[in-house]
């Protein structure tokens, strides 16, 4: 029933059915794992009703199937206190089944268990260190004498005896894979103890270890598991099962991991070909290596051939100059066509450059399905974080949901790196109590370590998504407090950038796509770049800063490719703020660039325009441009839909100047007699940068004075050591005199003529903009205006931008 609900829920498409298929079915023999009360390695307890449903009697031997194709045999006992559909098992059984508490396992009757003739059991080396005497007599004999215990080949079990417990592994059982050890069974325990390293195989990856790709996982399982496990399904319909899957996506999103997990969970033979490995200098050798790999896989069917980095061995044939590559591609094509369709061999390829693969490989019959393993969304990231932290010791305050919100654009590998970094952070804190020369580290120290939320936050500060490594941007440490004044502008920016990231549901509700771009213009030194930094910091989006001139290169077509690449990266790590500083360098009006490399600037601008229009509304990518020459920017960029908010950032007025002085001197010791208001009054027409310079200069004078005093003191002390004792320290601070001195050198960087230019530009904009300011709807009956809050709210979603923007401009122009 649940399945049906699930499938009808998810639009009833084939794929979502398959997600339903891959859900755990509700069946009587599927039980939820619970912690055992009596700690016995061979016993599981069930509720009497459950046993009745499964037609089991007390003391029956049952076969339990767990994850990663593991199963084991146990004895079933009834237990009234055990809840229904639960099964109680201890830690040893759980680890043999590779399950945790709360996982689902299936129970099957096992009538054909025989008494064993011989079993071969060996201890694990790290549990028998320092154990003297005969292990067989002390541990194994009493363990098997106290009950008839079923064992399964390959299982580990723990025997407590004397002072300690020893772990054993069942190496061989005779007659069958599982048997019951009776009193007359021979137990062999000769041989070297087993090494723990061989035991804990790390390549055991199951579906539980892959997170954030639920939809893709369903597709892959339907393409791989169904043909390998139930080929008759395809036969009965009369179609050929698919033969190839191409996984593509950014590096670190888990393509190879998925292939491993599929191979482990289906139990298929897994044959991994790493692209470059099959190359050889001898003619014909590389092709025969490929042929051998495919032959090997066909012998061991059902099998999966996984070609990692397939773009290295199957590039486009017309683009490659080497003969070998072409022959290898042709060989791969013929091999993939020649796989007999019933040979149960599936080829999986993985690449992060799907477009550099030969197109002949990407048709139906070779790689039939291409599955995009993309950057995970927030829920996906939470899954991945849970997987990576399931064995970590976390403190109570760790909020993984918060971490997954803050890691936009991270792929699985980045999240793994984040967890490692957080753990390292935890270890660093304990470094002062750890002595590296000691053989062993104190158990107390080890137990006291736990990764806390602060460690994660520090790690977040140090890491960034790998997609952005080369355009790496520090999210700047600039907050709104660092910016003096400009209240209107701040509010408008928050509406444009923060709302869509933090309240996307509101935009959906009003059916509006948020505006994508903002252009700051105004005289130099008024904080345009600073504003962009602050917005990047405040809204937790990724931030890519692009300096205009960097995009232009000497090669034809390269500059446009750079623009494309930057936008691709931004989309991959959305939500993202793209900040173009000095926009006028790449967005001048077209047609007047004479003599530069074949109009490179024009082509870059065209590329920019198409990219801005082609930005999918789904991805939250914002563009902020900053320029101090708005008059030469191509008008096509300034239309609504591209850079639709034009914000004039004027010279600061008196109040703003006071704020700027305050935020510049936040961290400096300023004497009580310095009146910042008077300074603000006096610095009419100064830009933010000029004011910062005044503060820096007065700081410099204060430092100079301080150092001179120190030198003077040293000299006096050298002359008369006694006299100096009672001299009290003077407080070092910036005094009014320093400001007065620095004001002598203060200068305005923006002339009145420049200001007039900006104001003229702003006014022309204002006129073209405020065209409908007289517009009112024809008088409606009074009733409707009362019943109009909804409409007012709708307007609120869109229109206040215009009004507040207009008002801001009015204020700013005449400030």
Curated annotation (Swiss-Prot):
Matching entries from Pfam families are given as: AAA, AAA_lid_3, CDC48_2, CDC48_N
Extract the SMART domains matched here.
Answer: AAA, CDC48_2, CDC48_N
Which CDD domains does this one have?
A: RecA-like_CDC48_r1-like, RecA-like_CDC48_r2-like
Enumerate the UniProt keywords alphabetically.
Acetylation, ATP-binding, Cell cycle, Cell division, Cytoplasm, Cytoskeleton, Nucleotide-binding, Nucleus, Phosphoprotein, Protein transport, Repeat, Transport
Residue(s) carrying Phosphoserine:
42, 720
Q: Which GO terms describe its biological process?
A: cell division; positive regulation of protein catabolic process; protein transport
Membrane is among the record's keywords: no
Q: Where in the cell is it found?
A: Nucleus; Cytoplasm, Cytoskeleton, Phragmoplast
Which GO cellular component does the record give, naming just one? nucleolus
Q: Which GO terms label this protein's molecular function in UniProt?
A: ATP binding; ATP hydrolysis activity
For the region Disordered, what residue ranges are annotated? 772-815
Q: Where is the composition biased (Low complexity)?
A: 780-798
| Modification N-acetylalanine occurs at | 2
Q: Does the keyword Magnesium apply?
A: no
Give the residues the record marks as binding ATP. 249-256, 522-529
Q: What family, per the record?
A: Belongs to the AAA ATPase family.
Tell me, in a sentence or two, what this protein's role is: Probably functions in cell division and growth processes. Interacts with certain SNAREs as part of specialized membrane fusion events where vesicles from the same organelle fuse (homotypic fusion).
Task: Write down what this protein is called.
Answer: Cell division control protein 48 homolog D
Could you tell me which species this protein originates from? Arabidopsis thaliana
């Amino acid at each position: 029933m649940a399945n049906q609900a699930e499938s009808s829920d998810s639009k009833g498409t084939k794929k979502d059915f398959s997600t339903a298929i891959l859900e755990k079915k509700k069946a009587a023999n599927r039980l939820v794992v619970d912690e055992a009360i009596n700690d016995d390695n061979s016993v599981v307890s069930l509720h009497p009703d459950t046993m009745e449903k499964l037609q089991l009697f007390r003391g029956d031997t049952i076969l339990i199937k767990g994850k990663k194709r593991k199963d084991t045999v146990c004895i079933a006992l009834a237990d009234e206190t055990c809840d229904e559909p639960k099964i109680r098992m201890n830690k040893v059984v759980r680890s043999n089944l590779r399950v945790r508490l709360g996982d689902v396992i299936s129970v099957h009757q096992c009538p054909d268990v025989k008494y064993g003739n011989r079993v071969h059991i060996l201890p694990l080396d790290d549990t028998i260190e320092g154990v003297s005497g005969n292990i067989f007599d002390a541990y194994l004999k009493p363990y098997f004498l106290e009950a008839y215990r079923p064992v399964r080949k390959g299982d580990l079990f723990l025997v407590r005896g004397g002072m300690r417990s020893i772990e054993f592994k069942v190496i061989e059982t005779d007659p069958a894979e599982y048997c019951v050890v009776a009193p007359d069974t021979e137990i062999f325990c000769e041989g070297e103890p087993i090494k723990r390293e061989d035991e804990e195989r790390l390549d055991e990856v199951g579906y539980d270890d892959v997170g954030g790709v639920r939809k893709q996982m369903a597709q892959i399982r339907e393409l791989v598991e169904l043909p390998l496990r139930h080929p008759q399904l395809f036969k009965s319909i009369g179609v050929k099962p698919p033969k190839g899957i191409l996984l593509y996506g950014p590096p670190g999103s888990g393509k190879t991991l998925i292939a491993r997990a599929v191979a482990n969970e289906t139990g298929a033979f897994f044959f991994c070909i790493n692209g470059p490995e099959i190359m050889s200098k001898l003619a014909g050798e590389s092709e025969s290596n490929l042929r051998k790999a495919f032959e090997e896989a066909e012998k061991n069917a059902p099998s999966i051939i996984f070609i990692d980095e397939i773009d290295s061995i199957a590039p486009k044939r017309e683009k490659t100059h080497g003969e070998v590559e072409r022959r290898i591609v042709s060989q791969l094509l013929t091999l993939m066509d020649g796989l007999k369709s019933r040979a149960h061999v599936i080829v999986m390829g993985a690449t992060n450059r799907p477009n550099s693969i030969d197109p002949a490989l990407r048709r139906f019959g070779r790689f039939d399905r291409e599955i995009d393993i993309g950057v995970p969304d927030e829920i996906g990231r939470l899954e991945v974080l849970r997987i990576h932290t399931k064995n970590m010791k976390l403190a109570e305050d760790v909020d993984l949901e918060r971490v997954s919100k803050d890691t936009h654009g991270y792929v699985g590998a980045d999240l793994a790196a984040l967890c490692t970094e957080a753990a390292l952070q935890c270890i660093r804190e304990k470094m002062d109590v750890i002595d590296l020369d000691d053989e062993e580290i104190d158990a107390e120290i080890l137990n006291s370590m736990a990764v806390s939320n602060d460690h994660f936050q520090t790690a977040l500060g140090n890491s960034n998504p790998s997609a952005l490594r080369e355009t790496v941007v520090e999210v700047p440490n600039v907050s709104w407090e660092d910016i003096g004044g400009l209240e209107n502008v701040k509010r408008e920016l928050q509406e444009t950038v923060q709302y869509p990231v933090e309240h996307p549901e509101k935009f959906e509700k009003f059916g509006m796509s948020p505006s994508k771009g903002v252009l700051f213009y105004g005289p130099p030194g008024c904080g345009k770049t600073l504003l962009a930094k602050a917005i990047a910091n405040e809204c937790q989006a990724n931030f890519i800063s692009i300096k205009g001139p960097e995009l232009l290169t000497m090669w034809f077509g390269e500059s446009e490719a750079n623009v494309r690449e930057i936008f691709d990266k931004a989309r991959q790590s959305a939500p993202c703020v793209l900040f173009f500083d000095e926009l006028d360098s790449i967005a001048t009006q077209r047609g007047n660039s004479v003599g530069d490399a074949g109009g490179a600037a024009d082509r870059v601008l065209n590329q920019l325009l198409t990219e801005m229009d082609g930005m999918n509304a789904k991805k939250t990518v914002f563009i902020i441009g900053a320029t101090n020459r708005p008059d030469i920017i191509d008008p096509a960029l300034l239309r609504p839909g591209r850079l639709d908010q034009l914000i004039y950032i004027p010279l600061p007025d008196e109040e703003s100047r006071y704020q700027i002085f305050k935020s510049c001197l936040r961290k400096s010791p300023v004497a009580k007699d310095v009146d910042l208001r008077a300074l603000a009054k006096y610095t009419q027409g100064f830009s933010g940068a000029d004011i910062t310079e005044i503060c820096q200069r007065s700081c410099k004078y204060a430092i100079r004075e301080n150092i001179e005093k120190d030198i003077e003191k040293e000299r006096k002390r050298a002359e008369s050591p006694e006299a100096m004792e009672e001299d009290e320290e003077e407080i070092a601070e910036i005094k009014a005199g320093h400001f007065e001195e620095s004001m002598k050198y203060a200068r305005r960087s923006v002339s009145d003529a420049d200001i007039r230019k900006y104001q003229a530009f702003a006014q022309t904009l204002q006129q073209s903009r405020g065209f409908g300011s007289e517009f009112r709807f024809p008088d409606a009956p009074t009733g409707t205006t009362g019943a109009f809050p909804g409409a007012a709210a709708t307007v609120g979603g869109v229109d206040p931008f215009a009004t507040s923007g207009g008002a801001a401009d009015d204020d700013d122009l005449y400030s």
